[in-house]
């Protein structure tokens, strides 16, 4: 570990914190319907879109109506994306003559991109046409990110409103998230990325002759526009197979830093939106503090583990940190920080190969996802996931003091707790259930490239990433098989919608309740005690649930490495 590394981490945290209030203020105005700087230009476009779609922007929906509209929208989006991928060979903007995507891979990819996961069992430059990348994937990157923001805003309204059955309009929230938040930032962001050296072209791939006389095909495409939304929207799917490790996706240290900031920007700012909309900004800062505590702990462990390197190599007197799988233009600190950021925020983009991290260094991204992607989390998804944990934490606090649990003047009762636990428990069910299945079936065991505990970790990481809607991978797993394409897709769909629906049900139940005035016995939820309780609940539920699986994978791998033991295929 170096002073330069810690300086990078400190600067990163400072920049993200500096964006929380201004971006939170702006998004609050957007979703409360107030005038913004962009309203003179965008408001007429917004009204025109509503007229064209036959939507009454003033008509709000109950939680069931909101959820129904959301699900219908995603079914349609899934079918359209699946059709684009299957018909790719017959569609235009295909200069490399890419063939149609296989049915099982198209199913997996469609599920992946509508759920904001962006798990990729293919190499983008060798599988997809420009049309599929733009109209199919980039389009869904905007829609899935906007959906997460919309659900978070609906849940905030559930806490903020009283004695009402409505949560707003899904169509309005979706439109405003794209039109006022995602698109304006992405336009400027794309220009910055082009300036940094990322291609943005519809020209064909280039056939080049190397200095040694060999032939090489240089893949190009509309890369910058996809990178902008994949980072800002915490989607994570790469235009190229190497993702953000590819110099055409992430060419410089500056582009790397800005991409990391953009991953956290909206998710962190939504905590401020929460505080503003419920009338007490301290509530938002308390939630952000809990997120920050978990994030800093993860960064410290991951950086320490990668800086110290493999214990097996250290036993031979080799030091200098673990540089395997890392780009030389990014040092160990930037690679470890990116890994923690991308898995804390359910982004899944990578600038280094997580499969090449040390056992403990690779365990941190795994744990980040297993905690429910609530450490900032995906845009919107992180906040509504954290608020689900808040409901459980408040319920636990009420049990400890023998009082009816209350949060922001709303009583937390049986329905809210049941829905919260449904949203929490569906993730380990997918992560651990499918991992167990893959480890006992020959088709599952054929996937990992490594034996022993690391091979188990590759399987566990895949299903954890899918259910947590992250999309990153221990890439030693060969996942492009019917078994993995199908099971990973199911994990992604359940991990997305079986959290969204309980979150909306909680919002509907809370919005219908009257606000109870605070009393002397009300548990304060804006201080260090609440932050500690919330972090404790997250660690207990997440940590204890997954500890046996972690013990079989990265923990055993680390202990075996410290004892000088390695595993070959077949061991």
From Swiss-Prot:
Disulfide bonds: none annotated. Pfam families: KdpA. This is Potassium-transporting ATPase potassium-binding subunit. The gene is kdpA. It comes from Methylobacterium nodulans (strain LMG 21967 / CNCM I-2342 / ORS 2060). The system is composed of three essential subunits: KdpA, KdpB and KdpC. The keyword Transport applies. Its main location: membrane. InterPro entries: KdpA. Keywords: Cell inner membrane, Cell membrane, Ion transport, Membrane, Potassium, Potassium transport, Transmembrane, Transmembrane helix, Transport. The lineage of its organism: Bacteria, Pseudomonadati, Pseudomonadota, Alphaproteobacteria, Hyphomicrobiales. It is a multi-pass membrane protein. GO terms for cellular component: plasma membrane. Part of the high-affinity ATP-driven potassium transport (or Kdp) system, which catalyzes the hydrolysis of ATP coupled with the electrogenic transport of potassium into the cytoplasm. This subunit binds the periplasmic potassium ions and delivers the ions to the membrane domain of KdpB through an intramembrane tunnel. One of its GO terms (molecular function) is P-type potassium transmembrane transporter activity.
């Amino acid at each position: 570990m170096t002073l330069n590394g810690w300086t990078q981490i400190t600067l990163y945290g400072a920049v993200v914190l500096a964006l929380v209030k201004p971006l939170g203020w702006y998004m609050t105005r957007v979703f409360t319907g107030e005038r913004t700087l962009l309203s003179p230009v965008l408001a007429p476009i917004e009204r025109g879109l509503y007229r064209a779609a036959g939507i009454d922007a003033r008509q709000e929906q109950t939680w069931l109506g909101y959820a129904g509209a959301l699900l219908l929208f995603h079914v349609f989006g899934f079918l359209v994306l699946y059709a684009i991928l299957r018909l790719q060979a017959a569609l235009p903007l295909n200069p490399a003559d890419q063939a149609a995507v296989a049915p099982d891979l198209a199913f997996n990819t469609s599920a992946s991109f509508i759920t904001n996961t962006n798990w990729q069992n293919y190499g983008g430059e060798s599988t997809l046409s420009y049309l599929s990348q733009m109209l199919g994937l980039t389009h869904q990157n905007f829609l899935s990110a906007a959906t997460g923001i919309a659900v978070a805003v609906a849940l905030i309204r559930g806490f903020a409103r009283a004695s009402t059955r409505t949560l707003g309009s899904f169509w309005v929230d979706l439109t405003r998230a794209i039109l006022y938040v995602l698109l304006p930032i992405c336009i400027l962001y794309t220009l910055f990325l082009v300036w940094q050296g990322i291609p943005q072209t519809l020209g064909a791939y280039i056939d080049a002759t190397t200095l040694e006389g060999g032939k090489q095909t240089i893949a190009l495409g509309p890369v910058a526009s996809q990178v902008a939304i994949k980072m800002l929207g915490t989607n994570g799917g790469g235009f190229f197979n190497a993702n953000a490790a590819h110099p055409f996706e992430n060419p410089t240290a500056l582009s790397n830093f800005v991409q990391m900031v953009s991953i956290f920007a909206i998710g962190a700012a939504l905590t401020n939106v929460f505080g503003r909309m419920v009338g007490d900004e301290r509530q938002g800062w308390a939630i952000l503090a809990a997120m920050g505590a978990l994030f800093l702990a993860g960064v410290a462990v991951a950086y320490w583990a990668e800086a110290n390197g493999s214990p097996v190599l250290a036993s031979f007197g080799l030091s200098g940190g673990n540089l395997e799988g890392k780009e030389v233009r990014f040092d160990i600190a930037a690679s470890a920080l990116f890994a923690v950021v991308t898995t804390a925020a359910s982004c899944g983009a990578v600038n280094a190969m997580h499969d090449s991290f040390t056992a403990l260094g690779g365990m941190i991204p795994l744990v980040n996802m297993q905690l429910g992607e609530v450490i900032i989390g995906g845009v919107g998804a992180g906040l509504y996931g954290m608020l689900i944990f808040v409901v459980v934490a408040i319920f636990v606090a009420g049990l400890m003091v023998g009082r009816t649990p209350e949060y922001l003047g709303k009583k937390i009762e049986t329905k809210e707790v049941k829905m919260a636990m449904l949203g929490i428990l569906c993730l380990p069910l997918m992560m651990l259930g499918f991992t167990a299945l893959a480890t006992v079936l020959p088709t599952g065991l054929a996937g990992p490239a490594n034996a022993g505990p690391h091979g188990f970790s590759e399987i566990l990481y895949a299903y954890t990433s899918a259910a947590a809607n992250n999309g990153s991978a221990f890439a030693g797993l060969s996942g492009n098989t019917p078994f993995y394409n199908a099971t990973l897709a199911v994990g992604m769909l359940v991990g997305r919608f079986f959290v969204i629906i309980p979150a909306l049900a909680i919002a509907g139940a809370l919005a219908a309740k009257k606000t109870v005035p605070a009393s002397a016995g009300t548990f304060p939820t804006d201080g260090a005690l609440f932050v500690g309780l919330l972090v404790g609940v997250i660690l207990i539920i997440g940590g204890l649930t997954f500890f046996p699986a972690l013990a079989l994978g990265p923990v055993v791998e680390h202990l075996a490495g410290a004892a000088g033991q390695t595993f070959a295929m077949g061991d």
